[in-house]
Amino acid sequence: MKAAVKFESVLKDHLADAEQAAKYLTACYEEGPEVFLQGLRDVVEAQGGMSRAARLAGLNRESLYRQLSRRGNPSLASLNAVLTALRLKLR
């Protein structure tokens, strides 16, 4: 019998690739703000974690956690900083 593979593990491996991450975020964006923020959290985790993203984006780690939380309301500047740090762009 084949061993089960966790979905989260497969997703994380998939999202480590910038091109795949961009496609994933585009699909998430089309579903609405809550889904987009969850997608962005997924990509951040897959590409090194929140601490790394905050450092590269020039943002405070705790603040970034709050902004990207389920109740978060990140500014456009923060979103742009994170996306730029991940080498992604809004179109």
State each model region's role.
Residues 46-66:
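Short alpha-helical DNA-recognition segment
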Residues 27, 42-43, 85:
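Short amphipathic alpha-helical elements of helix-turn-helix/winged-helix folds
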Residues 21, 36-40, 49, 60, ...:
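Amphipathic alpha-helical interface surfaces
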